[in-house]
Amino acid sequence: MRRSNKKSFDWYGTKQQFSIRKYHFGAASVLLGVSLVLGAGAQVVKADETVASSEPTIASSVAPASTEAVAEEAEKTNAENTSAVATTSTEVEKAKAVLEQVTSESPLLAGLGQKELAKTEDATLAKAIEDAQTKLAAAKAILADSEATVEQVEAQVAAVKVANEALGNELQKYTVDGLLTAALDTVAPDTTASTLKVGDGEGTLLDSTTTATPSMAEPNGAAIAPHTLRTQDGIKATSEPNWYTFESYDLYSYNKNMASSTYKGAEVDAYIRYSLDNDSSTTAVLAELVSRTTGDVLEKYTIEPGESVTFSHPTKVNANNSNITVTYDTSLASANTPGALKFSANDDVYSTIIVPAYQINTTRYVTESGKVLATYGLQTIAGQVVTPSSVRVFTGYDYVATTTKAVQGPYPKGTVYLAGTVQKDTVQYKVIREIVENDQAVLKFYYLDPTYKGEVDWRGTDTTGFIELLTTSPTTYKVGTIYDYNINSKITAPFTIDPTKNVMVFKESEQNEQGSKYRVIAQWSGDETTKGIYGKIYIATQVWTTKLGTNEWGWFDYSDDQAGIKFNNKGFWPAGVQNTLRNATPATAVETTYIYKESSKYGDVIVEYYDTDGKQIVNSVVDTPKSALGTEYNTDVDRRPASLVAADGTVYFYKEVKSDSAKTTGTVVAGTTTVKYVYEKAGSVNVNFVDINGKVIKAPVSDEKDAKPGYNYDTDLDQKLASITFEGKEYKLVPAGDYPVGKVGKGNNLIEVGNNTAKGIDPTTGKIEAGVNKEVTYVYRAVTGSVVVNYKDTEGNVIKDPETDVSDAPVGDAYTTTDKKPNEIITKDGSRYVLVPSKTDGEENGKVIEGTITVTYVYQKVANWIPEIPNVPETDRPKVPYPFDPTEPDEPIDPTTPGTNGEVPNIPYVPGYTPVDPKDNTPLKPIDPNDPGKGYVPPTPENPGVDTPIPYVPVKKVVTNHVDEEGNPIAPQEEGTKPNKSIPGYEFTGKTVTDEDGNTTHIYKKTPEVKNGTVVVNYVTEDGTVIKEPVTDTPTSPEGTPYDTTDNKPKTITFKGEEYELVRVDGTENGKVVEGETVVTYVYRKVETPAKKVVTNHVDEEGNPVAPQEEGTKPNKSIPGYEFTGKTVTDEDGNTTHIYKKTPAKKVVTNHVDEEGNPIAPQEDGTTPKRQISGYEYVRTVVDEEGNTTHIYRKLSNKPTTPEKETPAKPQAGKTASGKAQLPNTGEASSVAGALGTAMLVATLAFARKRRRNED
């Protein structure tokens, strides 16, 4: 089942109420303008339903096999249905038109500024004028450039607007009666933010030569119609105070959809209206849903840009109705609109209305030559009907005529942009809107060529692949009507007429694989509601296919389907769209211009100002405005100031009346009398201050600035400085002479240029010259000083030549002499001097002053000890420096203090001599009493500056003697002092004697005589063969020393692979050493080794035997209580050991039975002993192979007997049913079997030990 659709597209339905925004309009804003939105007023009806509507309708048949028509949702409008404005190939020209507009304002603003500068000095205003003129020059260059791009033009538009705004802001300071003295002649209304409320006006008199009656402060009839309403029944303006209704929407298509079978709702008898308030600085919109019947406001919201609100009243009318959402869409904002209001429900956009801008509607009063006399601006909302300010009387002018002109709409004339597209099955076309006048537009329809196979632009204005179908007549809003409809009947594309259906037939497609094709058709479909047949056009397609159920081919369209004629879908399907060709855009405002001509009964006097080159330097001023002929004037009194300041800031002084000037005094004549004055540029004198190299040491100063030519100046009197401090240094004027900077004259000023760092060589006195900026330069040199360092001893004697630390340094420079302060000085004669810091004279650190600073370092002469070493020439004798302490220069020298080398001074040791104190020949003390070779402690010098000789005296010869206790010499005497030593036959007693002469005697005693002996052990066989090397058991030892050779007595010895065993000992194994050698001989016999036997052992995991050892190699076997682990070990002798583990214990019981096996007592768990049972006597105990115990009893006879005394018997093996021997189980931890096992293990070990003993 296919659906049949009818949808509404209003190609003119988007209201456009913008205008150019002064200072804020350019080509860029054109590109950002908002196009109309498709789907405005979309509706859904049944396929066979005819809707009488002023809205456009799209009819589309898409049902291939069924006659049932199904209502469909209204078409959704999205970003793909809208398009930004696209410019044509003339976009550069359009942009230049905007640039011409904004540049036309620049001269007017600059002229006003010049007039103010002629009366007062204002540097800020002068700078703003200069900037505006600079930007104007650059803009004119772009206007003249035939190859300029849109981007370049737009950049100039922006630059000029910024400059003009800045200049306009400066001019606000200069007003007359609170009004600016000029207004701009612009083509478009001013949408610049204003403080005026909607309906308020403001007048400006531009021509200062005239007066206006009524005053420009009066509205003079200027007014607005506050609301912009359609002439539809029931639609009224808002009643909210200070709000103005600018548009409404009648909910027509929304209601048709809600009442359709799709929604099953109901129509809402209301309309929505939108209003702006009277504050032009705001953009909030009041949205009101209003009852058509009562006029009551059903629901309302104030919407800020970017917000959305929801109206819920429709659901109160019928629950199936959709809520209405109104979105203030700022994505559509531009310089001429804050955005658009989108009316939607369920994402279907039914209406899009652009919010108008606030704008100034200007009435102009101009002359026939185009000169603007005055303007009156009225604050409006774009689209409001304006009553202009009426004709006024201007002195000296006569009214001629009135003209009106529509204000530019949202886009400038020539703008082209995509209005919308239709892509329904085989119906494929686009609509492009072109602005042909400020208040007029046309629609151009292009259908897609059915044979075109290339790329298609559905989002822009590129018509490649399209064929132009028609262009509508220019449509606009006419006061008193609702819509303006198309009246153009011309079809652009080639077509033929199908007389059977009275439709125009256009191009057809190629056949597809099924033999089907389609062709484009159209039909004028307007009526009285569209003001004629050409107010609506039906654009559709027919398909070439077969009639359903037959092979009959033919052309079929949507109307056939609706008439019940069914046909096959062979790849193409027909569709159709009704297009209402109307303009729903109200006209933009109209501005009025009154034209005047000059009256011959009046005249005026203006004054112009020129420089000496004949160039006008400031704008003309009006001396006498339009006045009756014969009125007296005198410009010398009123309009000849002593000086003027040009727009570029140049100062001029009056010089004379220009040769072609009118008289400066007289009476007014018809027309304009022009008086011309000549002014000459002011002159200046600047003073510079540099050093001899040309470096600036003080900022230049102005001695005379913008002074009148001919005026005397004297910089020596006013600016010459004797000294200057710069960067902490003092500078003074230099005398006349040549310097790097150049030649300096007697006035201390530069008169010839040197190194080109300074070039001001004008004289220091003279006269101001017109247009000349004189430069005087004074030359300075830094004031200098020197620092000298002297070196003297404590007596004031010079010990070293003076040194210059700094020479000719600028005063104030830092200096330090510490780098020229040696701690020691050695003079040419070899004398040593040590610095005494406390006696330094002068400041070591400081700043240079003019003159010479002297710093004197004082040194102490430091002498030496001179050791007079015997046999050494006097010139070669060493010198031992005094350890002088410069921090304590007045303290005696301490000879034990380390010197400058860090060592304590000492007098050298000379063998055979002793150094003595020269004062009293007292021997000096050795530094180390035990080692005089380390030197001697020097004596304390009496004068640190005088050498102290150290004499050496010979010392007496000493000897060393070695004697026994009786004093007899036992070794030769030795010279010097020698230590004791080893002497054969003697030992040192520890006594040494030294006499007063230093002779040493060591005392010894005789060593006692000792007899020694040794003990040797031999190893031989019975026949005396040595089978082992002899061993010294006891080396040489004193007689009587105990010895024992058993530690050297092996039981066996292996010799040449055969084993020998000890059989006897010859000699004494234990005893005492005697003089000489004691011999002990061990005698051995060869061992005959029998063949080894192997055995098999059975042990548990701990190595304990669990069965008797067996000779030979036996396999593992079953052992009660144990199980084989699977492990068998064979040692190096071939013995085998099987390893077992204990079998887990099972639960056992104890039974008590008679000899027939009958129980005579209860069975007991575990192994329990026999017990006394009445009437029975114990016989024996049997333990089965499971470990269960059975005690057997014999029944007693009635005959009493005397019990026999039991005799303990050795345990015997009980008999079991199987006849196997069974060990009794006593229930104890160590059973008999365990004891037997232990005994067997002990026996085995004993046997093993005995075997090894035998082997030994």
Curated annotation (Swiss-Prot):
A motif (LPXTG sorting signal) lies at residues 1223-1227. Its main location: secreted. Pfam families: Gram_pos_anchor, MucBP, SSSPR-51, YSIRK_signal. It comes from the Bacteria. Residues 1227-1256 form a propeptide. The modification Pentaglycyl murein peptidoglycan amidated threonine is found at T1226. Residues 1033-1045 have a biased composition (Polar residues). It is a peptidoglycan-anchor. Keywords: Cell wall, Peptidoglycan-anchor, Repeat, Secreted, Signal. Residues 873-949, 967-994, 1028-1049, 1102-1137, 1196-1229 are annotated as: Disordered. InterPro entries: LPXTG_anchor (IPR019931), MucBP_dom (IPR009459), SSSPR51_Rpt (IPR027579), YSIRK_signal_dom (IPR005877). It is found in: Secreted, Cell wall. Small repeats lie at residues 663-681, 839-861, 1064-1084. Large repeats lie at residues 953-1006, 1089-1142, 1143-1195. One of its GO terms (cellular component) is extracellular region. NCBIfam families: LPXTG_anchor (TIGR01167), repeat_SSSPR51 (TIGR04308), YSIRK_signal (TIGR01168). This is Muramidase-released protein. It comes from Streptococcus suis. The gene is mrp.
